[in-house]
Amino acid sequence: MNFMELLLFVLSMLLAVAFLTVAERKTLGYMQRRVGPNAVGYYGVLMAMADAAKLLLKEMILPTHADKFMLIMSPMMTLMSALLCWAMIPFGPGITIMDSNYGFMLALAMGSVGVFGSLFAGWAGNSKYSTIGSMRSTAQLISYELVLTTVILICMLLTGTMNTSRYVELQESMWLVVPLLPLSLMWFMGCVAECARPPFDNVEAESELVSGHMTEYSSSMFVLFFLSEYASMLFYSTLTAILFFGGGTGLILGLKANFFAFTYIWVRAATPRVRYDKLIAMCWIVFLPLLFALALFMPSLIYIMDGYTFME
Protein backbone atom coordinates (compact mmCIF):
# COMPACT_ATOMS: atom_id res chain seq x y z
CA MET A 1 0.00 0.00 0.00
CA ASN A 2 1.59 3.28 -1.12
CA PHE A 3 1.33 6.67 0.56
CA MET A 4 -1.64 7.91 -1.49
CA GLU A 5 -3.65 4.76 -0.77
CA LEU A 6 -2.85 5.08 2.94
CA LEU A 7 -3.87 8.76 2.94
CA LEU A 8 -7.11 7.91 1.14
CA PHE A 9 -7.83 5.21 3.70
CA VAL A 10 -7.31 7.60 6.65
CA LEU A 11 -9.52 10.28 5.06
CA SER A 12 -12.21 7.69 4.32
CA MET A 13 -12.08 6.51 7.92
CA LEU A 14 -12.48 10.05 9.28
CA LEU A 15 -15.37 10.68 6.88
CA ALA A 16 -17.05 7.45 8.00
CA VAL A 17 -16.69 8.56 11.61
CA ALA A 18 -18.32 11.90 10.78
CA PHE A 19 -21.38 10.29 9.21
CA LEU A 20 -21.59 7.71 11.99
CA THR A 21 -22.37 10.59 14.37
CA VAL A 22 -25.30 11.60 12.15
CA ALA A 23 -26.52 8.00 12.05
CA GLU A 24 -26.29 7.86 15.84
CA ARG A 25 -28.32 11.03 16.32
CA LYS A 26 -30.97 9.89 13.83
CA THR A 27 -31.21 6.44 15.46
CA LEU A 28 -31.49 7.93 18.94
CA GLY A 29 -34.16 10.28 17.65
CA TYR A 30 -36.30 7.46 16.26
CA MET A 31 -35.85 5.36 19.41
CA GLN A 32 -36.99 8.33 21.51
CA ARG A 33 -39.93 9.10 19.18
CA ARG A 34 -38.56 12.33 17.73
CA VAL A 35 -37.11 13.34 14.37
CA GLY A 36 -33.44 14.04 15.04
CA PRO A 37 -31.29 16.16 12.66
CA ASN A 38 -33.30 16.96 9.52
CA ALA A 39 -32.52 20.56 8.48
CA VAL A 40 -28.90 20.57 7.25
CA GLY A 41 -28.73 18.90 3.85
CA TYR A 42 -31.01 16.15 2.57
CA TYR A 43 -32.53 14.32 5.55
CA GLY A 44 -29.90 15.90 7.82
CA VAL A 45 -26.94 14.00 6.31
CA LEU A 46 -24.74 17.13 6.26
CA MET A 47 -25.17 17.73 9.99
CA ALA A 48 -21.71 16.21 10.53
CA MET A 49 -20.15 18.93 8.35
CA ALA A 50 -22.02 21.63 10.25
CA ASP A 51 -20.89 20.21 13.60
CA ALA A 52 -17.28 20.01 12.40
CA ALA A 53 -17.35 23.62 11.18
CA LYS A 54 -18.88 24.79 14.46
CA LEU A 55 -16.23 23.05 16.57
CA LEU A 56 -13.25 24.06 14.44
CA LEU A 57 -14.31 27.73 14.41
CA LYS A 58 -14.43 27.88 18.20
CA GLU A 59 -11.54 29.38 20.13
CA MET A 60 -9.04 26.89 21.56
CA ILE A 61 -8.59 27.90 25.20
CA LEU A 62 -5.64 26.54 27.18
CA PRO A 63 -6.00 26.84 30.99
CA THR A 64 -3.39 29.04 32.65
CA HIS A 65 -2.00 26.40 35.02
CA ALA A 66 -2.21 23.48 32.60
CA ASP A 67 0.73 21.63 31.07
CA LYS A 68 0.16 23.01 27.59
CA PHE A 69 2.48 20.62 25.74
CA MET A 70 0.85 17.50 27.20
CA LEU A 71 -2.60 19.05 26.81
CA ILE A 72 -2.04 19.36 23.04
CA MET A 73 -0.20 16.06 22.54
CA SER A 74 -2.72 13.86 24.41
CA PRO A 75 -5.58 13.99 21.86
CA MET A 76 -3.09 13.46 19.01
CA MET A 77 -1.75 10.37 20.77
CA THR A 78 -5.26 9.00 21.29
CA LEU A 79 -6.31 9.53 17.66
CA MET A 80 -3.06 8.04 16.33
CA SER A 81 -3.63 4.95 18.47
CA ALA A 82 -7.21 4.58 17.19
CA LEU A 83 -6.08 4.82 13.55
CA LEU A 84 -3.05 2.51 13.83
CA CYS A 85 -5.30 -0.38 14.91
CA TRP A 86 -6.75 -0.52 11.40
CA ALA A 87 -3.39 -1.63 9.96
CA MET A 88 -4.20 -5.24 10.94
CA ILE A 89 -7.71 -5.42 9.48
CA PRO A 90 -8.04 -7.67 6.37
CA PHE A 91 -10.43 -5.93 3.95
CA GLY A 92 -10.09 -8.78 1.44
CA PRO A 93 -7.60 -11.37 0.15
CA GLY A 94 -4.22 -9.66 0.29
CA ILE A 95 -5.75 -6.28 1.20
CA THR A 96 -4.12 -5.58 4.56
CA ILE A 97 -1.89 -2.66 5.47
CA MET A 98 0.25 -4.85 7.74
CA ASP A 99 -0.23 -8.62 7.43
CA SER A 100 1.38 -10.09 10.56
CA ASN A 101 1.25 -13.53 12.16
CA TYR A 102 0.42 -11.73 15.42
CA GLY A 103 -2.21 -9.43 13.93
CA PHE A 104 -4.81 -9.61 16.69
CA MET A 105 -2.30 -9.01 19.48
CA LEU A 106 -0.68 -6.11 17.60
CA ALA A 107 -4.08 -4.52 17.01
CA LEU A 108 -4.94 -4.64 20.73
CA ALA A 109 -1.45 -3.42 21.65
CA MET A 110 -1.77 -0.41 19.36
CA GLY A 111 -5.23 0.33 20.71
CA SER A 112 -4.03 0.17 24.31
CA VAL A 113 -1.66 3.11 23.70
CA GLY A 114 -4.75 5.33 23.71
CA VAL A 115 -4.95 4.84 27.48
CA PHE A 116 -1.91 7.06 27.86
CA GLY A 117 -3.63 9.83 25.91
CA SER A 118 -6.58 9.98 28.30
CA LEU A 119 -4.29 9.63 31.33
CA PHE A 120 -2.02 12.49 30.25
CA ALA A 121 -5.02 14.63 29.25
CA GLY A 122 -6.52 14.35 32.73
CA TRP A 123 -3.23 15.15 34.41
CA ALA A 124 -2.30 18.04 32.10
CA GLY A 125 -5.67 19.78 32.47
CA ASN A 126 -5.02 20.64 36.15
CA SER A 127 -8.69 20.04 36.99
CA LYS A 128 -10.21 17.69 39.54
CA TYR A 129 -12.84 16.55 37.04
CA SER A 130 -10.19 15.79 34.43
CA THR A 131 -8.04 13.93 36.94
CA ILE A 132 -10.88 11.74 38.24
CA GLY A 133 -11.99 11.06 34.68
CA SER A 134 -8.49 10.02 33.60
CA MET A 135 -8.13 7.71 36.62
CA ARG A 136 -11.46 6.09 35.81
CA SER A 137 -10.46 5.78 32.16
CA THR A 138 -7.14 4.13 32.97
CA ALA A 139 -8.65 1.58 35.37
CA GLN A 140 -11.59 0.77 33.07
CA LEU A 141 -9.61 0.42 29.85
CA ILE A 142 -6.80 -1.65 31.37
CA SER A 143 -9.32 -3.95 33.08
CA TYR A 144 -11.31 -4.65 29.94
CA GLU A 145 -8.20 -4.99 27.80
CA LEU A 146 -7.52 -8.10 29.88
CA VAL A 147 -10.98 -9.39 28.98
CA LEU A 148 -10.48 -8.77 25.26
CA THR A 149 -6.98 -10.24 25.26
CA THR A 150 -8.17 -13.40 27.05
CA VAL A 151 -11.05 -13.81 24.58
CA ILE A 152 -8.65 -13.53 21.64
CA LEU A 153 -6.26 -16.04 23.20
CA ILE A 154 -9.11 -18.55 23.63
CA CYS A 155 -10.11 -18.07 20.00
CA MET A 156 -6.49 -18.54 18.96
CA LEU A 157 -6.37 -21.84 20.87
CA LEU A 158 -9.31 -23.05 18.80
CA THR A 159 -8.11 -21.83 15.40
CA GLY A 160 -4.35 -22.13 15.89
CA THR A 161 -3.51 -18.76 14.31
CA MET A 162 -3.21 -15.07 15.19
CA ASN A 163 -3.02 -13.96 11.55
CA THR A 164 -6.20 -12.02 10.78
CA SER A 165 -6.34 -13.05 7.10
CA ARG A 166 -5.84 -16.73 7.90
CA TYR A 167 -8.41 -16.44 10.68
CA VAL A 168 -11.07 -15.30 8.20
CA GLU A 169 -10.28 -18.23 5.88
CA LEU A 170 -10.76 -20.74 8.72
CA GLN A 171 -14.34 -19.53 9.28
CA GLU A 172 -15.55 -20.33 5.76
CA SER A 173 -17.26 -23.53 6.94
CA MET A 174 -18.69 -22.19 10.22
CA TRP A 175 -18.60 -18.88 12.06
CA LEU A 176 -16.88 -18.99 15.43
CA VAL A 177 -19.93 -17.47 17.13
CA VAL A 178 -21.69 -20.87 16.83
CA PRO A 179 -19.49 -22.83 19.27
CA LEU A 180 -18.50 -19.77 21.33
CA LEU A 181 -21.72 -17.78 21.75
CA PRO A 182 -21.18 -16.96 25.49
CA LEU A 183 -17.64 -15.86 24.67
CA SER A 184 -18.90 -13.57 21.91
CA LEU A 185 -21.32 -11.89 24.33
CA MET A 186 -18.51 -11.24 26.82
CA TRP A 187 -16.38 -9.93 23.96
CA PHE A 188 -19.08 -7.49 22.88
CA MET A 189 -19.59 -6.17 26.41
CA GLY A 190 -15.82 -5.81 26.76
CA CYS A 191 -15.71 -3.82 23.51
CA VAL A 192 -18.45 -1.47 24.74
CA ALA A 193 -16.50 -0.88 27.96
CA GLU A 194 -13.21 -0.48 26.08
CA CYS A 195 -14.75 2.24 23.90
CA ALA A 196 -16.27 3.86 27.03
CA ARG A 197 -19.68 3.83 25.35
CA PRO A 198 -23.00 3.84 27.23
CA PRO A 199 -23.94 2.13 29.50
CA PHE A 200 -20.25 1.98 30.46
CA ASP A 201 -19.47 5.68 29.85
CA ASN A 202 -18.28 6.35 33.41
CA VAL A 203 -15.11 7.92 32.00
CA GLU A 204 -16.99 11.05 30.91
CA ALA A 205 -20.17 10.79 32.97
CA GLU A 206 -21.72 14.21 32.35
CA SER A 207 -23.78 14.22 35.54
CA GLU A 208 -20.69 13.50 37.65
CA LEU A 209 -17.52 14.70 35.89
CA VAL A 210 -18.68 17.34 33.36
CA SER A 211 -16.82 15.58 30.53
CA GLY A 212 -14.14 13.54 32.29
CA HIS A 213 -10.60 13.88 30.94
CA MET A 214 -11.94 16.09 28.10
CA THR A 215 -13.32 18.77 30.43
CA GLU A 216 -10.62 21.35 29.60
CA TYR A 217 -10.70 20.76 25.84
CA SER A 218 -12.38 22.79 23.13
CA SER A 219 -12.19 23.41 19.40
CA SER A 220 -9.90 21.16 17.32
CA MET A 221 -8.40 19.35 20.32
CA PHE A 222 -11.85 18.17 21.38
CA VAL A 223 -12.54 17.08 17.79
CA LEU A 224 -9.51 14.75 17.93
CA PHE A 225 -10.84 13.02 21.06
CA PHE A 226 -14.27 12.80 19.44
CA LEU A 227 -12.85 11.24 16.27
CA SER A 228 -10.76 8.75 18.24
CA GLU A 229 -13.81 7.53 20.19
CA TYR A 230 -15.85 6.81 17.08
CA ALA A 231 -12.87 5.41 15.16
CA SER A 232 -12.35 2.96 18.03
CA MET A 233 -16.03 2.05 17.96
CA LEU A 234 -15.84 1.29 14.22
CA PHE A 235 -12.62 -0.67 14.73
CA TYR A 236 -14.05 -2.90 17.45
CA SER A 237 -17.21 -3.40 15.37
CA THR A 238 -15.05 -4.58 12.46
CA LEU A 239 -12.94 -6.76 14.75
CA THR A 240 -16.10 -8.37 16.14
CA ALA A 241 -17.22 -9.18 12.59
CA ILE A 242 -13.84 -10.79 11.86
CA LEU A 243 -13.42 -12.61 15.16
CA PHE A 244 -16.83 -14.27 15.45
CA PHE A 245 -18.77 -13.70 12.22
CA GLY A 246 -16.39 -14.77 9.48
CA GLY A 247 -15.19 -11.35 8.36
CA GLY A 248 -15.66 -11.01 4.61
CA THR A 249 -14.50 -8.85 1.76
CA GLY A 250 -15.44 -5.30 0.89
CA LEU A 251 -19.18 -4.75 1.17
CA ILE A 252 -19.87 -7.86 3.27
CA LEU A 253 -17.38 -6.85 5.96
CA GLY A 254 -18.72 -3.29 5.88
CA LEU A 255 -22.30 -4.43 6.38
CA LYS A 256 -21.34 -6.64 9.32
CA ALA A 257 -19.28 -3.84 10.91
CA ASN A 258 -22.13 -1.34 10.42
CA PHE A 259 -24.56 -3.72 12.09
CA PHE A 260 -22.39 -3.91 15.21
CA ALA A 261 -21.80 -0.15 15.16
CA PHE A 262 -25.58 0.35 15.19
CA THR A 263 -25.80 -2.18 18.02
CA TYR A 264 -23.62 0.17 20.10
CA ILE A 265 -26.14 2.93 19.40
CA TRP A 266 -29.13 0.74 20.25
CA VAL A 267 -27.51 -0.26 23.55
CA ARG A 268 -26.91 3.41 24.33
CA ALA A 269 -30.56 4.28 23.74
CA ALA A 270 -31.96 1.36 25.73
CA THR A 271 -29.80 1.07 28.87
CA PRO A 272 -29.00 3.31 31.86
CA ARG A 273 -25.43 3.94 32.99
CA VAL A 274 -23.87 1.20 35.12
CA ARG A 275 -22.31 2.32 38.40
CA TYR A 276 -18.51 2.48 38.17
CA ASP A 277 -17.71 0.03 40.98
CA LYS A 278 -20.20 -2.46 39.51
CA LEU A 279 -18.51 -2.13 36.13
CA ILE A 280 -15.04 -2.90 37.49
CA ALA A 281 -16.39 -5.73 39.69
CA MET A 282 -18.08 -7.28 36.64
CA CYS A 283 -14.69 -7.46 34.96
CA TRP A 284 -12.62 -8.89 37.83
CA ILE A 285 -15.25 -11.00 39.61
CA VAL A 286 -17.41 -12.26 36.72
CA PHE A 287 -15.74 -12.04 33.31
CA LEU A 288 -12.12 -12.93 34.04
CA PRO A 289 -12.84 -16.04 36.20
CA LEU A 290 -15.28 -17.30 33.55
CA LEU A 291 -12.75 -16.69 30.79
CA PHE A 292 -9.94 -18.44 32.68
CA ALA A 293 -12.25 -21.42 33.29
CA LEU A 294 -13.14 -21.51 29.59
CA ALA A 295 -9.44 -21.39 28.69
CA LEU A 296 -8.87 -24.49 30.84
CA PHE A 297 -11.84 -26.20 29.16
CA MET A 298 -10.69 -25.30 25.64
CA PRO A 299 -8.45 -28.38 25.05
CA SER A 300 -11.48 -30.63 25.66
CA LEU A 301 -13.58 -28.55 23.25
CA ILE A 302 -10.86 -28.79 20.61
CA TYR A 303 -10.79 -32.59 21.00
CA ILE A 304 -14.59 -32.83 20.65
CA MET A 305 -14.76 -30.58 17.58
CA ASP A 306 -11.67 -32.01 15.87
CA GLY A 307 -12.33 -33.34 12.39
CA TYR A 308 -15.26 -31.20 11.27
CA THR A 309 -14.45 -27.61 12.13
CA PHE A 310 -11.44 -25.27 12.20
CA MET A 311 -8.71 -27.78 13.07
CA GLU A 312 -6.72 -28.66 9.95
Curated annotation (Swiss-Prot):
Pfam families: NADHdh (PF00146). GO terms for cellular component: mitochondrial inner membrane. The keyword NAD applies. GO terms for molecular function: NADH dehydrogenase (ubiquinone) activity. Keywords: Electron transport, Membrane, Mitochondrion, Mitochondrion inner membrane, NAD, Respiratory chain, Translocase, Transmembrane, Transmembrane helix, Transport, Ubiquinone. It is an enzyme of class 7 (translocase). PROSITE patterns: COMPLEX1_ND1_1 (PS00667), COMPLEX1_ND1_2 (PS00668). It is found in: Mitochondrion inner membrane. The keyword Repeat does not apply. GO terms for biological process: aerobic respiration. It comes from the Eukaryota. Its EC number is 7.1.1.2. Its main location: mitochondrion. It is a multi-pass membrane protein. Core subunit of the mitochondrial membrane respiratory chain NADH dehydrogenase (Complex I) that is believed to belong to the minimal assembly required for catalysis. Complex I functions in the transfer of electrons from NADH to the respiratory chain. The immediate electron acceptor for the enzyme is believed to be ubiquinone. Belongs to the complex I subunit 1 family. This is NADH-ubiquinone oxidoreductase chain 1. It comes from Debaryomyces hansenii (strain ATCC 36239 / CBS 767 / BCRC 21394 / JCM 1990 / NBRC 0083 / IGC 2968). The lineage of its organism: Eukaryota, Fungi, Dikarya, Ascomycota, Saccharomycotina. The gene is ND1.
